[in-house]
Amino acid sequence: MSIRTDKVSSLLQRELSAIFEKELPRSGPLVTVTEVRMTADLGIARVYVSVIGSEAQRAEVMEYLDAENKMIRKTLSAKIRHQFRRIPELEFYEDRLFEQANRIEQLLKSVKPARDEEQH
């Protein structure tokens, strides 16, 4: 990636995080923008979000983001329109890295006691 795409990604991540903080219901699951990847022409922003909640809540949040894509893009445009000629299209993807890390941690914890028992 170039310095320009990195800067745009960082700006979009910051602004989208602020939008989600204001727009999403407080009682729902925790939604975090973990990464934004830009295409080389800056036309598409792939937004990776981490959703901490039940499987149903995660699905609901992803459906909401897809359904409200135009509204989110319009809100983003109002915030950054002076910095860009063209606001990128937004594509939302669920980032399950946190969930996978927790699963690995649980597996490691379950293996460790078995090793300790073998040594005694």
UniProtKB/Swiss-Prot annotation:
Any GO CC annotation of this UniProt entry: cytosol
Q: Quick check: keyword Cytoplasm in the entry?
A: yes
InterPro entries associated with the record: KH_dom-like_a/b (IPR015946), RbfA (IPR000238), RbfA_dom_sf (IPR023799)
Where is the protein found, in the record's own terms? Cytoplasm
Sorted alphabetically, the keyword list is: Cytoplasm, Ribosome biogenesis
Where is it mostly found? cytoplasm
- Record flagged with keyword Cell division: no
Cite a single GO MF annotation: ribosomal small subunit binding
Superkingdom per UniProt: Bacteria
A matching Pfam family: RBFA
Q: Which GO terms describe its biological process?
A: maturation of SSU-rRNA
Q: Which SUPFAM superfamilies does this entry report, sorted A to Z? A: Ribosome-binding factor A, RbfA (SSF89919)
The record's similarity note reads: Belongs to the RbfA family.
How does the annotation summarize its subunit structure? Answer: Monomer. Binds 30S ribosomal subunits, but not 50S ribosomal subunits or 70S ribosomes.
The job of this chain, per UniProt, is described as: One of several proteins that assist in the late maturation steps of the functional core of the 30S ribosomal subunit. Associates with free 30S ribosomal subunits (but not with 30S subunits that are part of 70S ribosomes or polysomes). Required for efficient processing of 16S rRNA. May interact with the 5'-terminal helix region of 16S rRNA.
| NCBIfam families attached to this UniProt entry | rbfA (TIGR00082)
Q: What is this protein called?
A: Ribosome-binding factor A
Q: Which organism is it from?
A: Chlorobaculum tepidum (strain ATCC 49652 / DSM 12025 / NBRC 103806 / TLS)
Q: What is the gene name?
A: rbfA
